[in-house]
Amino acid sequence: MALASGNRLGSARGQTCADASGRVAPRLLSRACSGSPLALGVLACLGAASSVKPHPRLPATTSAASAPLPARGPAPCAAVPTVVTPDNATGVFEELAAGQQRKYIMISGKGGVGKTSLSASLAVKLAAAGHTTLVVSTDPAHSLSDSLAQDVSGGRPVLLQGTDLPLWGLEIDPEEAKREFFEGSGAGQDGEAGGPSAASQVSDFMNRMGMGFVIDQLKELKLGELLNTPPPGLDEAVAIAKVVQFVQAAEYARFSRIVFDTAPTGHTLRLLALPDFVDASLAKVIRLRKKLNGATSVVRGLFGAGESQDEAVEKLELLQQRVRMVKALFRDKTQTEFIIATIPTYLGVNESSRLLQALRAEQIPCKRIIVNQIVGPQQGDAYLRMKMKDQIAALEMVANDPGLRPLRKVIAPMVDVEVRGVPALSYFGNVVWKDVYDQMNQGADRKFFLLGGKGGVGKTSCSSSLAVHFANDGLPTLVVSTDPAHSLSDAFDQDLSGGSPVKITSPLGDELPLWGLQLDPEQAKAELRAVLADDGGKKLNETLDGLGLGVISDQLKDLQLGELLDTPPPGVDEAIAIAKVVQFLKAPEYSHFKRIVFDTAPTGHTLRLLSLPDFLDASIGKLVRLRQKLSAATSAVKNLFSGGQPGEEDVAVKRLEALQASMEDAKAMFRNQQTTEFIIVTIPTVMATAESCRLASALQHEGIPLKTIIVNQVVQANATDKFLTARRADQARALHHLEEDTGPDGLASLQLIKAPLCDLEVRGVPALSYFGNVVWK
């Protein structure tokens, strides 16, 4: 296995393709970037200089791709040397561009395969073909602004500057979606129509009945909170629905093409399931709100609700209509198409195969797959030189960013074959971890390591190699994948699914103290349902009957509160699964594990995962409080007539308390400075480094211990054409693996599009225009 690394971090300076303002100087570009097909292609697409300002979230870049467009738009690209000649089937772009009726194109796949560049380049090409185009990012860790070299955040379509192309960009604002939910749910009504007066009515009524002690048990329930807690993932579902709302409005009717840059696979699968979940959840809340209209003021007072629920119901029903619109849109073959994006590796192809199965199961239209980053036969030493030059800017960002500067820096080489299996991981780990291993190994007897970062930067390879390194050192080690789109089994070439630790075997016969575990979200979800099991509300209804409140009990039973508790929201499964890992590590049979390495999902997913214990702590806390208070109220009523005999303990309360305790353990583990370390994995590109800067800031804000950053896939100075020859052979094996995935639902049934590995980062409209002309033929 040959290596391609060599630049010491931050050692190379100067020689950029941009001036101090971030604008590209064509004369300097042609001199400094001579020999780069991408740079030459950009120059061919450039006209006069423009005054477009650099994207405010990024420093001036060395990439030719950040060059602004001329004011009058790009001239047709001249013939330039191509990095590869894809053997794409003809008519791909013609089909995507045909007709003026609106089409939605969603590009999804494994993290780091270039979805943003592919989406943005397709949007640029569609706009150049005359379509009024909107490119939308639904990834919680946005990269679209970085790719377009213009800020398109804020939750509203932004017209791209410096070009006359009819092209808009939009990064979805999840906070806006949450605000809309709170408005619709009636949060904050307590102090308005009927709030305090309704609550006082409840107290007066109970006191008149001589049952003031019951209201003491009930008044802390805050039942209204059950209506006002948005589930995890609602933000994305509502946000996509909001895009549909945008394009239905008269002012946005002009969009004939909408391209979605989606989050990595696991997140996208969740996104596709969200409309069903949100639709069902909203239906329950709407039904509850409607029934509250006919309830007595006493019952309404328990929810802090005013006399009329009409306005809240109207808002929630509008929200529900939009969510249903998205649900239908995903499955409409005449309007929507999913394109799977992957790279020529076994891990990438296997994940794409699983994604296609999921899309088929959900009846999502998908007929194309694009294999990106293919090393072409014309790429040689000149390509490697350009790649080394282009990575300088990113390495300098890592060295100089205030959030990343204090971290230990690990430079991991780009290798010429895919790192799979224990021997390859052992070799890779010896190269990567040798300089920091002793420091990381110091301290606590048992340590946790979480590796995270942008999709496709090599988190699974890095985490697996670290686990093998610990095991080679004699430390009993468990490596855990929390990514819904698992790659851990592929990395070890061994099935690690099932939700329990599996002993990892080496083909060399070595007896390593190493186990692997892919968290099983479905199993975790089933366990959560068991914890929340309420027999359709039967247990709750029995409790309400026990209160002996007559019509009030009847009305509360009619509200079917149990239904609000029986649907675990998306995202909860992972948090429960992680809590389960933390829990079973406390058990005596797992006490021998000294090192636990987490291979986490891509950035946006990981940030949500780290905040989920807080969400669950709050939501599970409400459920525990609800059960406890109702049980206590029932006991109080029973004691009144039974002479003070203690009431039976609610089994569900015990289960919920245990779950809450494990959540607390997980939350504490994430933040323990002595036992836990988060390691950011990135690659030497400006876009990936910019995302790493944002991730570091978010982790530090959450109080997560962060000490190390790995810059992976660094091309070394001693890399030669032999390195690329080996890469091409390895990629050919992966492409053959794709072609062998036959059958009606296999990858071989899809139209194959091939896209080149570029020697410079694809950023800015000119580079996207050139890249799009190469790919979308």
From Swiss-Prot:
Domain of life: Eukaryota
Alphabetized InterPro entries for the sequence: Anion-transp_ATPase-like_dom, ATPase_ArsA/GET3, P-loop_NTPase
Keywords from the named record: ATP-binding, Cytoplasm, Hydrolase, Nucleotide-binding, Transport
GO CC field: cytosol
EC identifiers of the protein: 3.6.-.-
Phenotype upon loss of function: Small chloroplast and strong decrease in chlorophyll content. Defect in the accumulation of photosystem protein complexes. Defect in the accumulation of TOC34, an essential component of the outer chloroplast membrane translocon (TOC) complex, which, in turn, catalyzes the import of nucleus-encoded precursor polypeptides into the chloroplast.
Functional note: ATPase required for the post-translational delivery of tail-anchored (TA) proteins to the chloroplast. Required for the accumulation of TOC34, an essential component of the outer chloroplast membrane translocon (TOC) complex. Recognizes and selectively binds the transmembrane domain of TA proteins in the cytosol. This complex then targets to chloroplast, where the tail-anchored protein is released for insertion. This process is regulated by ATP binding and hydrolysis.
Family: Belongs to the arsA ATPase family.
Protein name: ATPase ARSA1
Gene: ARSA1
